[in-house]
Amino acid sequence: MRKACMAGISVLIGISMLAGCGKSLDADTDTVYVQKNGTVLSVDVETLDKDYYDETELKDYVTDAVSAYTGEHGKSAVKLENLSVKDGTATLKMKYKTPEDYTGFNGIELYEGKVVKALAAGYDFKTDFVSVEDGKVTGTATKEEIYSGEDLKVVIIKANRCESRRYNLLCFK
């Protein structure tokens, strides 16, 4: 029998449209960060609850996966930034040239673009929206407000969670 709930590999936490594209991404939970230039940074945090996990083996596994992917898609498509294991928690930091590289490498759909193009691509927005100013939620936003914002961009990540499809959405200017 399949487990009742599958752990999500990545959760959309933050997106920045600020000029600070060179900043490092520090997170203590699974995070995907789409930079202004389209580069994707991710942090995956996993609790290693078994004694047989080995940092060297994990790093070798990730390095081999990166080498296989970059061999087909170009050297700069995916980069292992850092892998560390501390106090039973593994933290993996990765960099992807494009959202398509993130999707191709992880098998998790990541879309970044204008809301209008997302609608044309078949994404639906049957969810609740919030207004965000200076990184803080300030209220709710209607679908009409979202659809009418020609310059609004969206990041959508689709991952299997608890045996069902779930969309994580964030719109930004």
Regions found by a protein language model. Give the residues of each.
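Post-signal-peptide N-terminal segment of Sec-exported extracytoplasmic proteins
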Residues: 41-67
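Short, cysteine-centered beta-strand-loop-beta hairpins and adjacent loop/turn segments enriched
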Residues: 23, 49-54, 99-104
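Sec-dependent signal peptide cleavage junction
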Residues: 18-34
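Envelope-exposed proteins and targeting segments
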Residues: 28-30, 36-38, 88-90
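Beta-strand elements of well-folded, non-transmembrane domains
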Residues: 32-38, 46-50, 96-100
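Short amphipathic beta-strand and strand-loop transition segments with alternating hydrophobic
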Residues: 31, 77-85
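Sec-dependent N-terminal signal peptides of Gram-positive bacterial secreted proteins and lipoproteins
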Residues: 2-23
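Mature, soluble, non-transmembrane domains
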Residues: 83-173
